[in-house]
Each structure stands twice: as C-alpha cells, then as structure tokens.
Swiss-Prot record:
Subcellular location: Cytoplasm
Role played: The RecF protein is involved in DNA metabolism; it is required for DNA replication and normal SOS inducibility. RecF binds preferentially to single-stranded, linear DNA. It also seems to bind ATP.
Disulfide bonds: none
GO molecular-function term, one example from the UniProt record: single-stranded DNA binding
Protein name: DNA replication and repair protein RecF
Residues involved in ATP binding: G30, N31, N32, G33, S34, G35, K36, S37
Top-level taxon: Bacteria
A Pfam family of this chain: SMC_N
Main localization, broad class: cytoplasm
GO BP, sorted A to Z: DNA replication; DNA synthesis involved in DNA repair; double-strand break repair; SOS response
UniProt GO cellular component terms: cytoplasm
Amino acid sequence: MGLSRIAFTNLRNISSLKLDTSARLLLFHGNNGSGKSSLLEGVYLLGRGASFRTKELDYAVSHLSDEMVCFGEAVNEDAGKSFRIGVSRQKTGKLTRVRINGESARTLSELAAALPILIVTPDTFGFINGGPGERRRFVDWGVFHVEHQFKVVWQNWRKLLLQRNKLLKSGNISRSELSAWDNQYVAYSDEISRYRDAYFAELKEILIESLKESSEQTRDIGDKLTITLSNGWYQNDVNHMDQLASSVESDVKKGFTTLGPHRADIKVKVGGVHAKEVLSRGQQKTLITHLYLSQLEILRRRTNQRPIVLIDDVGAELDTGNQVTLLTRMLEKGAQVFVTVLDKQQSEYLFGHFNQEYDTQMFHVEQGAVTKVHN
C-alpha cells in the first residue's frame, strides 16, 4: 500500500499543495513551524479521519478559511488497484466528510481499514513511562488490522460500557437491570480479551526474536525481557460477573465502570524490574522501536498489507545510527515512509544512504510551501 499523490487545501499553514508521493521514502526538512508536521497531519487524516496533533479538528483548518480538504490517491501494488480518499472539515457546523472512491464512508473504521497508517512521534517514545491509554491503542491498532471482527466486538462492548456508566451515574439502579447489562458486558469484554491476548502472544514472540537477532545489546534485553498484558480485571481466574458485582458500590460512588478492557495495560520488565528503572533512555527507545517493527511484521505476515508509516521529527529521539536502523527495517517490511527532519544535512545524509536501494524523494518545507530537492 502506498500513496501516489496528495493534495491539501487550507490545512493549517498549507494553503494549497499538490505532491507526487509515489516514492518509498519521503524526507521533508525545514524549520520549526514550516509546515512539516502539518503535512504528516494531512496524510494521517486520510487514514484516520482525525488528527494526531489535536482532538478538535477545527484547529487543523487554516484560520483564513472555513473549510479544509485533504485528498489522496493510494495504490495497492499487490492487487494492482488504486483508490481515492477525500477528507474535508467545515468549521461551520463542525462537519467532517469522508469519501472513498467518491462514496461517503459510513464510519472512520472504513477509512482505517482502507489505508493503514502507523505514526511515530517524539511522544511515542514515552510508551514505557506514559499512561496505559497509549499502550492499549497500540495493541488495538494491531488487532483491528488483522482481525476483521474485532471492530464490531469493540463497538458493541463500547456501547455497553457507556450504557452501564450512564446507569451508574443516574443513582437509580435496579440490580436486576444492572445484572442484565453486566452479562452482555462481560461476554463482549472477554471476547475483546481473547482477541488481544492472541495478538499480544504473537507480538511478544516476534519482539523477542527481533531483539535477539539485532545486536549484542538488544540480545541481552531480549533474554531478560518479560512483557505482559493485563486484561483490566482484578484477577483473570476469578469469575468476571462476580468481580463486577463486588465492585458495584465503588462504581456507583465513582460514576463509572472500574473493571474491563478499558483498564487493560502492558507491563514491561527487564530482569524482573520495571523497564523504566533499569533501561537507559536510549535502550528504552531501542525497545520501543522494536515493538513497532514487530507490529509491522505481524501486519505483513497476516494480511500482506504494507502500511504507511509517518515519523515526525525523527532526530528528536533517535541518533543517526538508530534512525538508519529504524528506516531500514521499516522499508524492508514494505512500508512507505514519510519522515520529517529539522536539519537539512541530516535529510541529505538519509537521502544519500537510502536512495541507491529505495526510491527516495527529498523536499524542503518553508511557510507551508513544499519544494522537491531530489527526485
């Protein structure tokens, strides 16, 4: 999968942009505020219908306009087919329109399935030390793209969670009514856990294999690594209905459900100690890099899909050697990679390193304008 061309209008400081993006590796350099991250934001919008920079999509629309439009043409090389994606946002009425081949998409998940996009930002490298939400999203992104039924199960579970929370907040709770909701809630929760557990077992196996094959340093981490996925319950071997029943009083006081898939988390330990306590910042980055590479490998094995990877400010958290390693492994797995770089010399170095083996393009970004530097 790859984007062959993009066209953005009124996306932050990008007033109008048309770009051939058919290369495997695309490097964008420019000063802070030049529009590099906005360009990646536009590509991300094509695959997610949302922004990775803000929860309020209106902020992505130029302050000089009421409407933003992002267009992309993607090519599935294996199937020999191309398709078009369009995402627009109007500030007036806060209206977002999504079209695939001219037809309105009913849900954003249709967009995500059509154009798998994985993003790596400086925040990504807080995976180990950050909150559990980011780690859950990491797992669910992977499951969504390899298990087609997961979306339906997740949506049904989410509706039940919201309904249960509404009932808890009402203060007018019938135990029999709550029990009826809980039966369905537990059933869907357990199904989500089964999908996650199966995916995570495969991810863990590939991750450890990847670490052991990379270098002596990562091999040592792989030998001592234990990575586990908790499913959001107090105890997995204790009946989940009983656990929900015992937590009702606490849930009523808090006004929300405290047990279930939304409380799941990943624990990473090395030699039995939390990774953040024993791994240097550099070692943590290496481990997280291998996690994302393992996710790409599962996608390749299970679906033969090759996603689009966006890397924002690659030099912020990785030195040159690790940048080359990350990009090499991603390109080897068939990904199309968009990279933003602050330093022109670094961009030129990466271009020179990769251009002989992979079709590489380099661009300069300034005040929302993008100029091709190398073919």
